[in-house]
Amino acid sequence: DVASREAQSIRPVPRPTAGEENRNYRFNWDSPFAISHHDPATIYLGGNHLMRSRDRGTTWEEASPDLTKMIDRDTVSIMGRLVTDETLSRHDGISSYGNITALAESKHSPDVLYVGTDDGNLQVTRDQGVTWTNVIDQVSGVPPRTYVSRIETSYEVDGRVYATFDGHRNDDYSPYTFVSNDFGSTWRTITNGLPEGWSVNVIREHPENSSLLFLGNEIGLYVSINAGGSWGRMQNNLPPVAVDDIAIHTRENDLVLGTHGRSIWILDDITPLQELSDQVLASAAHLFGS
């Protein structure tokens, strides 16, 4: 409450079960959450389970089983060695391992949800979480256990979903970027024009033009006007900086970038970009709207 300054925590707490009296959820340093496109009272939060609240966070339910690979991080070697209690900076900077790092709800149906994890799972449900399918094996060329950095569902095309992966923690800086048009059953890569050596943090589709995509990586902003067929860097006065998040202000049609250490950047009124196409670029002249 802004006026009274009253606040309360809405973080879900697991209920003890038989044989698991000390259950704990595993949350990422940047746990993803989302407000439903279909019901503003419904909130999703990623732990190792997908959590769902139908009353703005007052109560929570598990909308999934554990969607991770459930790997004990103490069994994962670092440079060929297992960590011990004596290891300096043990798990430094890693709050937990085996948790949800990306989630998205279909903009066409509340039944369809997508989840990505830090240990490389890509899960989809089409019945509000009753059953889940791990479709990561359908994503060609991504090494096992690669961190899922973002999932984006299409405003226009039902069944279309984008996914990006970030392998820099394993010394892999490939720009893994994919699209599926069948709810994740098959995927194809859309990296033409993206520079090698810079991992991808985020991808967004324009709400009114499904061919207009924006992508943030470790050195800046990239744009596609042909649904990912090709990408070009968009810089102007934007410094070379990691773009961690992208939002499109639907009322003002502004492009908003969240960067790593260089503040928030806003490009006012991207209507000309919204109208841009290969045909416009090939024409002798074009009058853009306002």
Give a label for each model feature:
Residues D1-S290:
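Beta-propeller blade termini and top-face loops
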